[in-house]
A protein has these predicted regions:
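Cyclophilin-like peptidyl-prolyl cis-trans isomerases
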Residues: 2-225
Length: 225
């Protein structure tokens, strides 16, 4: 049974640290993809009007994640998720993801990365963005979506790739805001499958951590520049 949470409608105005763990008793099919969030600026307002890019590129951008287990090429959907794509590309352009790991791996669910170094140190991020889960895109196998805390508008850098269709992660309504899909794997799904199959363990408060770190060696825009 999937536990439903009540979400606070406003951003928390101070530092928050929430462990990236599966909710107790929910197992591999957990509906909550949680991330740790550490913000340098305690006061900010996330504005959909001011944050949305004014223009979209005609040609979809693709980003290649070069990992220690193979490459993954992701095509970004800027039309459906302009804020999320802009945010993701900002981290790519800053080389933020280089040297980070897939820190949470659950086969037949998803692989999550974009926030931790191999020694499980969480990286500082930019302020969070609005949740664009109500954009018509679904959390199907091979899609990439933003991880977040229980607060809907809390995604920063962490993302996950769906290892199977996860309809329980899709937008339903304000009480079930879902997880924002912003692209899909177009090359390297076999790499995703390999990562999903690695042996995992518990490291401190973090569950489902690969025993041998799966490192994102680099993340680069490879087309649509």
């Amino acid at each position: 049974m999937i536990r439903r949470l009540l979400f606070v409608p406003l951003l928390v105005p101070f530092l928050i640290i929430i462990a990236a763990v599966v909710l107790p008793g929910m197992g591999a099919e957990a509906s909550e993809i949680r991330q740790v969030a550490v913000f340098q600026k305690p006061n900010f307002v996330v504005s959909e009007e001011t944050e949305r890019p004014k223009q979209m590129d005609a040609k979809p951008k693709k980003v290649k994640l070069e990992t220690t287990m193979g490459d993954i090429v992701i095509e970004l959907d800027e039309k459906a998720a302009p804020v999320t794509v802009k945010n993701f590309l900002t981290y790519v352009e800053e080389s933020f993801f280089d040297g980070t790991i897939f820190h949470r791996v659950i086969p037949n669910f998803m692989i999550q990365g974009g926030g931790f170094t191999p020694d499980m140190v969480q990286k500082r991020t930019h302020p969070p963005i609005i949740n664009e889960a109500n954009n018509g895109l679904k959390n199907n196998r091979g899609t990439i979506a933003m991880a977040r805390t229980p607060q809907p508008d809390s995604a920063t850098s962490q993302f996950f790739i769906n290892h199977k269709d996860n309809p329980n992660l899709n937008y339903v309504d304000a009480r079930n805001p879902g997880y924002a899909v912003f692209g899909k794997v177009v090359e390297g799904m076999e790499t995703v499958d390999k990562i999903a199959a690695v042996k995992t363990t518990q490291k401190g408060p973090h569950a489902n951590v690969p025993v041998e770190p799966v490192v994102i060696k680099s993340a680069k825009v490879v087309s649509g520049k």
